[in-house]
Each structure stands twice: as C-alpha cells, then as structure tokens.
C-alpha cells in the first residue's frame, strides 16, 4: 500500500461546457477514500501558470481558485509551481520529512513518460514508485487531456535535465555558508581542503546540507550532489568537470591516474595539473598527500580496515614509484574523522590495533574497545618514512571528532545508514 499518493493534474484542461469540475472533484474524493486509511501524504500537483483557454476549456488553476477545491483542502496538499521540477522537488522534501518511500503517482497516460523522466532524476532507489493511469477515472470524456508529451528524444531528456539543474541552482544554501578547512602544511601551488556539512542544498536531516556522495541506499539523488559539487567548486576554485572521487572498497588499492582505472580503489595519485582528486569521509579519514618537489599529489580513504591494510602508505608508495617522489618530501594531512571517544570495534578486530601499538586502543579488556584510527595512521606513516613534522593530524577543525560535532560534520556512527559524506580534495594548480 502506498505511503504517499501524488495526483498529477497539471497536464489536463477542463471542459466548462460539460460541467467537468464536479466530476473531477468526485474522482478526487474517490481517490482520497481509497488511499487515506494507509497513505500519510496525499498531494495534488497543479500548474501555477495555467489559465483560461479557448473554446470554453480551463486550466486546473481555474478550478483551484474556485469553491470546489476548498472542500478538498483538508484532504490533499496542493503543490503548484511554474515548472514540474520545482513541484516534484518540493514534494520530495515533504516525503523525506515523513521518511516515506512507497509512492503512487496517478498521472494521465500521455504524461507518464514525462513523469518517469523527472522521477528518475530526483529520486533514488530508496523510493519505490507505482504509476497509475489517471484517465481510467474519467467518464464520458468530460476532461480533455492536453497535447500528448512523449519523452523519447535525447533533446527532450536534456531539456528536463536542464530544467532540474536550473531549479536546484536557485535554491538557497542550508545550515550556513560553505566552509572549507585547509592545512598550512600544503604549499600554495596545490589547491586543497576538507569540507564540512554546511553550504549545500541537501535537505534530508542526516544529509543536510553539503552531502557530496549519492548512492542507491541514500535519499540524495545524483543531481543534488552534483549541485553541491558545483557550489564547492565555485567556492574552492577548481573545475567541477575534472573532479574524481575514490571508488571505495575499504581496502588498499591505489589508482594511478592515467593508467587503467580499477573497479574499486581507496587511493588516487596524479601529477596532472587542474585535476581535482577526492577522498570520501564520514568517520573514515580522508587523507591528502602533496609533494611540492616532484609536483605530485594523492588522496586516500582510510577506514579501520583500510588503515590496517596500509592504504596510507600504499598511496605514498605509488607516488614514489610513479613520480620519483622522495618519501621525506611528501606532506600528509589527515582530515576530520571519528575520534577514539566514539569509535569502538569488537575485541577480535581491536587486537590488530593493539598489536600495532597499545596506545591505539582504550579499554582493551572490554568487549568493544575504543580504537584510535588517527594515531594508528600516524604510526604507520612514520614507520614508512614520512617525517613526523610532515604529518598534520591536529589543527582546529581537522582533529574534531565527526561523531561528536553534528553541526559541522556527517557521521555514519552517529546517523546510521542514510549518512552524508564530506570529502578531502587536492589538485595541482594549472
């Protein structure tokens, strides 16, 4: 049974000669009667700029302004915007507020492909959609559908994409200004930083607002994340078209940019100018690497598994092997991550950190000891030859625990499966 029911009336014209207003209202009453016992959200989509048409036909706004719709005010929410992208995104926000995922869309047959194209852009696989033909409810052709819309060409799909992107660009930033944390260790010929959660448009509470990763298991669609990346690129000064994320596997594979890209990897290295590489983080450590001598850089995603597998030194070693870097020239900066105050592991997993160094584990005798993945990363880097003074793991916001600071950072430990993602990024300036 649907948790939310959306009724698309924006593509219809009303035939005033046949008293179709009452027929439509009766049909809406019937839809409400059928779905109200289970659905938590019932909504009618209208077109704000509809107007009186020729030959006695009226747009839906004419009905909305009349007395007929007033009797439905307590039964349906009405969403009316000049463009369908705005209407559907507004509805998505309302659905997300209620944490709903099963959605029925009652839509005229000639608009079904159109609606599916918008839904495909604005929603993820978290949501389950069912489409029902609205025309089956009409009697005696009292309502006349407008000219058919077929979303079949590349140009039409591009137009939808453009409409959605244009609308998202118009939205205000949430939770304050976009903030980027940087390290004084990284020289100016590199562009780098670590993001916080402010300054984006993501509205789901655990993803708000500068979420920078989309997946089938979360509620932020790719187009919203792309808008967040665009805003970050404008603020930081990099080219969003040359933006590469790690394809996380919680392991130690490193992609050398310019060579064949692996299916998954937790490190990237490059010496290409103007290319921005990024490591994801939401408790795991986003790490950036820079060699100002050989003009090369890298990033790594280091969770507890990747830490033990040596992903940080694997990234360093790739820079040495590919670009002739000297280990003593490489600068390493650890971005915000979960602290030992909040991160625990089963004892059988914590044993490996204790073996690395006892100071990496607190309450070792408990069933779930507290583990310091940042300290473990520093130890492994120093053992690999990175100079202690070339490692930055403590500075203002860089060493804040992501789980302890919900106003600044996303956290899987704190927020569960629908968590947001911040990043560490670096590029060699052009």
From Swiss-Prot:
Tell me where it resides.
Answer: Cytoplasm; Nucleus; Endoplasmic reticulum; Peroxisome
Q: In which tissues is it expressed?
A: Predominantly expressed in myeloid cells. Highly expressed in primary macrophages and dendritic cells sorted from the peritoneum or spleen, respectively (at protein level).
Q: Which reaction does it catalyse?
A: adenosine + phosphate = alpha-D-ribose 1-phosphate + adenine; inosine + phosphate = alpha-D-ribose 1-phosphate + hypoxanthine; guanosine + phosphate = alpha-D-ribose 1-phosphate + guanine; S-methyl-5'-thioadenosine + phosphate = 5-(methylsulfanyl)-alpha-D-ribose 1-phosphate + adenine
A Pfam short name: Cu-oxidase_4
Q: Print the keywords alphabetically.
A: Acetylation, Cytoplasm, Endoplasmic reticulum, Hydrolase, Immunity, Inflammatory response, Innate immunity, Metal-binding, Nucleus, Peroxisome, Phosphoprotein, Transferase, Zinc
Principal subcellular localization: cytoplasm
Q: What is this protein called?
A: Purine nucleoside phosphorylase LACC1
The species is: Mus musculus (Mouse)
